[in-house]
Amino acid sequence: MVIERVLSAAGWSRCGQGDWAVVLVSPSGRLAARVSPFDPVMPYTADLFRRAAATALVPVLHASREFEGGAVYTVMERLHAAEPHEGKAFFRALAARTPEVTDLARAIDVVVERARRELPWFGPLDENPSNVMRRDGGDLVLTDPFYADGPNLYDSLLADPMRVARAIPEEKRRHMFELPLAESGPFDPDARQRMELGLAAADARLGQGRLP
């Protein structure tokens, strides 16, 4: 990805990767950048970080940008792994809406309501304990609470590509087949070709005003 190459040239180094994104750490070690060629959920995560900034229960967001074609990146404070039991306790507090997390829970509600209206493949709150991390000062923060239902989204490209074409503008998904897929492995070549052809045909029909 061009964004990763630019950051690498500036001295940033890759420190992790998953199915949707790679993570780089700044030369100072104080910042982390998450870079994805396609992540329709990331704008909602950035929205949450802004809305809930005053709670000090989300990372400090230094930058967030969507590029032409759909690539996205965010820069935030670098965080460190917390103990699994701490993450579980954090999510229990959210579920119970205990006083110390009430404002965060309300911010999550607002973002989730909007996301579910706009993105059919928006997943529920991801309660994986690893999504709670620790900042340098020791405080716990919620880092990656939302996710796209990837299997369902990509299956939709085979079953109903028009649904995807309508829900996600073409200019926001040009790189949707360039995901790192570090955990689940690469796309099946035949399935990928069928996905691409189906989506291209759907885009052509939309562009010509020929809606089914």
Predicted regions and their residues:
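ATP-binding glycine-rich loop module of kinase domains
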Residues: 5-55, 59-65
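Conserved hydrophobic "DFG−1" position in protein kinase catalytic cores
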Residues: 25, 35, 75-78, 134
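Conserved structural core of kinase catalytic domains
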Residues: 37, 53-110
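C-terminal catalytic region of ATP-dependent kinase domains
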Residues: 164-165, 172, 177-212
